[in-house]
């Protein structure tokens, strides 16, 4: 079981890829003017990535985000000079998308449209998938496991693997309480960045060979185990992806090689239930028992 650790990207997550892709594509097309404000609805990682890219390329950035997402995300975006507009939790993901559209139309801002922008999966085809194919050139690869938020990674990588390595099984995963691809109703969940209350336009719904939903607690506990047992500190969605990969491994033929995508770092979840029950004081009781 191997993992692709996307927290090594400069902004700390896989979303750096789509942020750079969308901005460069818009510049080339002339739809983004010099100095124009960029706005996007985000669960956090895309917002951080866009804030970073916009800061580097000279665009003001406004993030529209549900109030349910971690405070670390807001602070990171503001560190890059972004403005953050919060929407009520009851309005869900579709509410923050709607608010971003309204503000873009009102002020003449450039709307990034990560959920429907074809530059999103296209960049994963040319970079993420290319990296995987290069790393596994001449080597066995049987399974690729990825969750979905916008669907860009799953779609772009999945499509290229199907072309280049058609025997590779594409496995997706989503919150057990909001398994939209499995035909279930959306319910609030704690796997931040995954599965808004709609299926994005860029998501290829038929690319996955298997869907393994994962519940919030399993996602959290697997992320904790990965940090304490393997020294890889990741976020909740990465924990969920690894949990799905472990389930896939249980049912895979002996000797199978599985690659799981780990989207981000655990450092932007310090205020969330990923750290629920973790001691914040001195470990005096432990020391006394030594």
Describe these PLM feature segments.
Residues 1-290:
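PLP-dependent amino-acid enzyme catalytic core
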